């Protein structure tokens, strides 16, 4: 009986740990895409700064 209790607790802890890891991975993906879009817009501004179209 004691073995079954330990096994159940171990399985519950394992499932909780995998649930906690999912939001972290999603947040990292959102952060990476935000950094990527910022890099693209900053690169655009750097290349087009001072051009006649940017002065308007």
UniProtKB/Swiss-Prot annotation:
Entry GO terms, CC: extracellular region
Propeptide: 22-30
GO molecular function annotations of the record: toxin activity
UniProt keyword list: Disulfide bond, Neurotoxin, Secreted, Signal, Toxin
Domain of life of the organism encoding this protein: Eukaryota
Disulfide bond positions: none
Post-translational modifications reported in the UniProt record: Contains 2 disulfide bonds.
Tissue: Expressed by the venom duct.
Keyword Transferase in annotation: no
Comment field on protein domains: The cysteine framework is XIV (C-C-C-C).
Name used for this protein in its record: Turripeptide XIV-01
């Amino acid at each position: 009986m004691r073995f079954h209790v330990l096994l159940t607790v171990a399985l519950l802890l394992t499932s909780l740990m995998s649930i906690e890891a999912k939001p972290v991975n999603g947040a990292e993906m959102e952060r990476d895409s935000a950094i990527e879009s910022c890099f693209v817009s900053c690169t655009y501004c750097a290349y087009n700064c001072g051009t006649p179209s940017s002065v308007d």
